[in-house]
């Protein structure tokens, strides 16, 4: 399992995306709510190191067993913002306002997607992110990622909670495309929104 998942690019066909919280900056935390079926799971990190290699390829992976239970499984909690992921974009209803929100994320697409929520400078677009990625991710990223969920398959639903201050934000998907292996952001899967 460890060796197969360390290979860059899409996961092997036998590995099923389960989602989870997206990466957290040093000293911070991230959250996600999901329902796990009994089975074997791997927690891993695909975030690139300064040398361009993923943390996963350097060994950042941990196996986990989810045991069956005879207790009823709790229902997925609701949220106040519905977010759709599609090939290659995002939808949000209603538009976010300042404050703490729980995003209910549904993959409405034909392939896996993720959502990375980033804080941007006022008036910033997503072009600096694309340039940073195409330039080999040299230096710090052009915004501060702080919330979201990792890859979920078509039809999967997960939640995450984030506190939004007034400002400019971006949504990005870095999942490798099923067709050409390029990150979905290169296919236009990024957008900005403003919170007032």
Tell where the protein language model's regions lie, with residue ranges.
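Extracytoplasmic/periplasmic copper-protein system
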Residues: 1-11, 15, 50-91, 95, ...
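Aromatic/His-enriched, Gly/Pro-containing loop or helix-boundary segments
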Residues: 12-28
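Surface-exposed loops/turns
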Residues: 26, 37-38, 97-98, 154, ...
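Short strand-edge motifs at loop-to-beta-strand transitions and within beta-strands
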Residues: 28-34, 156-162, 191
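A short tyrosine-centered beta-strand micro-motif
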Residues: 39-45, 101, 164-173
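Short edge beta-strand/loop segments characteristic of extracellular beta-sandwich folds
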Residues: 102-108
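Beta-strand signatures of extracellular beta-sandwich domains
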Residues: 114-118
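Intrinsic, low-complexity N-terminal interaction/targeting segments
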Residues: 148-149
């Amino acid at each position: 399992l460890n060796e197969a998942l360390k290979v860059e690019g899409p996961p092997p066909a036998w590995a099923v995306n389960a989602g989870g919280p997206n990466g957290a900056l040093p000293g911070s935390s991230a959250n996600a709510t999901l329902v796990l079926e009994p089975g074997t799971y791997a927690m891993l990190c695909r975030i690139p190191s300064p040398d361009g290699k993923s943390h996963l390829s350097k060994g950042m992976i941990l196996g986990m067993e989810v045991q069956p239970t005879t207790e009823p499984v709790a229902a997925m909690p609701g949220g106040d913002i519905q977010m759709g992921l599609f090939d290659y974009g995002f939808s949000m209803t209603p538009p976010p306002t300042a404050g703490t929100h729980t995003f209910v994320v549904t993959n409405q697409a034909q392939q896996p997607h993720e959502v990375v929520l980033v804080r941007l400078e006022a008036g910033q677009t997503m072009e600096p992110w694309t340039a940073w990625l195409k330039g080999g991710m040299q230096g710090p990223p052009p915004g501060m990622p702080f919330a979201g969920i990792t890859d979920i398959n078509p039809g999967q639903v997960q939640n995450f909670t984030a506190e939004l201050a007034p400002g400019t934000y971006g949504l990005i998907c870095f999942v490798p495309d099923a067709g050409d292996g390029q990150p979905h952001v290169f296919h236009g899967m990024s957008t900005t929104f403003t919170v007032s």
